Regions:
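Active-site neighborhood of glycoside hydrolase catalytic domains
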Residues: 1-53, 80
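Substrate-binding clefts and catalytic carboxylate motifs of secreted carbohydrate-active enzymes
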Residues: 30, 42, 46-151
Length: 151
């Protein structure tokens, strides 16, 4: 698939997270080293061994409940290693539907099991750093601080 995209669009960045599981194809399957939820030590180990490719955390800092602790450990790597490109927080936004509550008549956000659907992931869809209505969660304060967006 990488060959197809490179032929159609030579400037396209191709990412395949699974390449770290099988190094036989690393030279021609992905343009970056990428992992999900790799601990900072593993990221550092890769970056200190003369890497051929930049490193991107395709998922990190899952924000279910109060779980952005340890973000500083990843942010510190940005200033230490030129080939560390940071990562993507999972999820950015809660996944919910705005519906009218049948009892109060007010608009409410519902997700995972609120519609009597089974099986369900329950609140697992509510793991963003902003709510589904686009208002910020408390975790956004920490993200802004470490990303340098504080006002």
């Amino acid at each position: 698939m990488n060959a197809y995209y490179k032929k159609r669009d030579p400037g396209r960045l191709v990412h395949y997270e699974g390449v770290f599981q099988n190094r036989d194809y690393e030279d021609n399957i992905s343009d970056v080293e990428s992992q999900m939820y790799a601990p900072p030590g593993r990221v550092r180990e890769y970056l200190e061994n003369e890497p051929k490719k930049p490193f991107i955390l395709c998922e990190y800092m899952h924000d279910m409940g109060n779980s952005l602790g340890g973000m500083k450990s990843y942010i510190d790597l940005l200033d230490q290693y030129e080939k560390y490109q940071g990562g993507f927080i999972w999820d950015y936004i809660d996944q919910a539907l705005l519906v009218k509550d049948e009892i109060t008549g007010r608009e409410v956000l519902r997700y995972g099991g609120d519609f009597d659907d089974r099986p369900s992931d329950y609140e697992f869809s509510g793991n963003g750093i902003i709510f589904a209505d686009r208002t910020e969660k408390p975790a956004m304060q920490e993200v802004k601080y470490y990303y340098g967006l504080q006002k």
